[in-house]
Amino acid sequence: MIFVIIAVSILATPYKTIETASARIVFEESSEKRAQEIANYIDKLNEYYGDKTEIKLNKIPIVLRGQDNYSNGSYTNMPNRLEYILIPPINGEMGVTPWLMDLSIHEYRHYTQFQMARENTINKFGYALFGNMYSFLMTGLTIPNWAIEGDAVSTETELSDNGRGRVPDFLKDYRALLIENKEFSYEKAKSGSFKDVVPTVYHLGYLLISYGKEKYGDEFWDSIFVNGSSPNNFTPFSNELKKKTGLTSTEFYLEAMKYYKEKFKKEKFEEYEQVSLKLDIPTNYRYSFKYKNSLISLKKSYDEKASFYEIDNRNEKKILGLGILSDDYFELKNNKIIWAEIEPDLRNEKVNYSN
C-alpha cells in the first residue's frame, strides 16, 4: 500500500491513517475531515451488506487522493483496495448526492461484487490457490462490464435520495434512441461504437439491472454474480441468466429494450426543429456563445479532439484545438475565451493541475 502511494504522489506529502472495523483509510493530512466522513459511510455499508447477505467482507484498504484535478474512484483487488479522488464533479451528472457518499456506495458495491464472485465452489478453490489474481481474472472474463457498472449505478440510486438513476440527463440518449426506434444489437450496445451514438455500459447496465430487479425481484442479480463467474463453461454469466429467466443475454437485452421503448414513448415530450447539421460522425456542440454575428462553440466528435469553432450560417471555422479538458464549460467575455485544461505533473502520475 505504501508503495502504491509513494510511486505516484509527491514524496513530501504527509499521510495519516484511520482504522475502523470495516476499513483502513490512508489520506493526506489535509483531508482528515473527509476521511472521517468516508469511514462513516463504509461502516454503514458494511453493516448493510452484513445484514443483507451472508458474504464475509474483510477490512478494505482505502486510499484518498487529493492531488488529482478530476473526479473519479476505483476498486481493484491487485492489491485489494478502493481509491477515491476527492474533488467532486462540477457538471451535475451525478445528481445532488454528496460526492463522497455517492463514491462510497458505488465503489464499495464493486468490492462486494468481487466478494460474491468468490462464493461459488470452483472460485473458492481457485482463490485459495492463486489469491486475488484468480478473482480478478475470473470476474473480469466472465461478468460483462454492463452488469458490473450497471449494478453499482443501481445501488447508488437505491441507497441514496438521488443517484444517477434519478437524474433525467442520465438516460437522455437512450430515451432519444428508443423513441426514434433506433436500436442496436446486443454486441454493439455493450461494446460501443465510433460510428453511432451508443450510450456507455453505465447507462446500458443501469437499464438492464433495473429491468431484472423489476421483473424478477430485488435479489435477482446476487445469485447471478455468485454463480455467473464460475469457469464451468465458456459463457457462465449468460448460462446463469438463462437458468433464471429462460433467456440468453441477447434475448434478455432485446426484451428489456422493448419494455423501455414502450415506457419512454408514453412519456410526454415536445418536438423541436433541428438546427444543427446532420453529420455522419456523432458530434456535440457545447455551450454556444454569441459573438458578433456568429456563435462560438466547443465542438467534440469521435474523429477530432475538442476544439473551439466559430459558426456562421452553418459554416464552421476552427479557432483552436484544445488539450485535456477539466470539463466542457467555458466563458466568452471581452473577446476572450476562458477554459480550464488538466496539465499532468511530469514526475508524479497521480498529481495534475488545472490551467
Residue ranges and their predicted role:
Residues 1-16:
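Bacterial Sec-dependent N-terminal signal peptides
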Residues 263-284, 312-328, 355:
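Multi-bladed beta-propeller domains
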Residues 99-102, 144, 280-296, 318-342, ...:
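Conserved beta-propeller blade repeats
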Residues 165, 169, 299-308, 322-327, ...:
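A flexible loop/linker signature enriched in serine peptidases of the S9 family
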Residues 288-289, 295, 304-311:
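Beta-strand-rich binding/interaction modules
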Residues 14-18, 75-76, 286-289, 308, ...:
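Short, exposed beta-strand/loop patches in secreted or surface proteins that constitute
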Residues 12-138, 144:
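Juxtacatalytic substrate-recognition/specificity segment
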